[in-house]
């Protein structure tokens, strides 16, 4: 464990994650390009291939952050669809609103505060739900999946893009060495969050896979939440995964 670092407890996690992303919001997109070794857009193209959204669909982007997936969703449902993005970080939403305002999809997108574990929408509202790079950060994966299932229309599709634990012990070891060595350095040299800082964003992110399920275990959690037609695709030697599931159709 990084010297002096204490991960947040489940009870503290929501507030910790909110403060963390408020702190890194302005540099978030640039740092993702660096940490992904330039693979960011490629992974997002793979994500788009899994969505199957259509013009006119109403889509929810959970933990939308600065709006990467939100904008990709909007491009698929244009010209008359709608996309709502929710996030617990006002800092991330502020960056996202600037990006949306400069995009051709500004009239299709609404960004608002919202919690993945308590979504402020009625049952059976959305044709599709997306979530990118956030499932590791929720306090309860089962509760989050249950909420997403609830707000999907029957037959609606959920697509989750996330970092992943490789099945291979050799690859997993190398990946964790990279994450747990390189990411904490960003706190020191970019975020200026030293050893005594309460919130150390990239040190936290370097530990966020420690207790995260393997891809097959996450797929099982999808099924336990009610999803059918579940599947996952592994990218980058299994260090990134796209999980999909469909809400059971009525009848």
From Swiss-Prot:
Query: What is the superkingdom listed in this entry's lineage?
Result: Bacteria
Which Enzyme Commission numbers does its entry carry?
Answer: 2.1.1.163
Leading EC class: transferase
Instruction: Give UniProt keywords alphabetically.
Output: Menaquinone biosynthesis, Methyltransferase, S-adenosyl-L-methionine, Transferase
Give an example GO molecular function.
demethylmenaquinone methyltransferase activity
Q: Part of which pathway?
A: Quinol/quinone metabolism; menaquinone biosynthesis; menaquinol from 1,4-dihydroxy-2-naphthoate: step 2/2
This enzyme catalyses: a 2-demethylmenaquinol + S-adenosyl-L-methionine = a menaquinol + S-adenosyl-L-homocysteine + H(+)
* Amino acids binding S-adenosyl-L-methionine: 66, 87, 115-116
One GO BP on record is: menaquinone biosynthetic process
Gene3D superfamilies given in the database record: Vaccinia Virus protein VP39 (3.40.50.150)
Similarity remark:
Belongs to the class I-like SAM-binding methyltransferase superfamily. MenG/UbiE family.
Q: What does this protein do?
A: Methyltransferase required for the conversion of demethylmenaquinol (DMKH2) to menaquinol (MKH2).
Q: What is this protein called?
A: Demethylmenaquinone methyltransferase
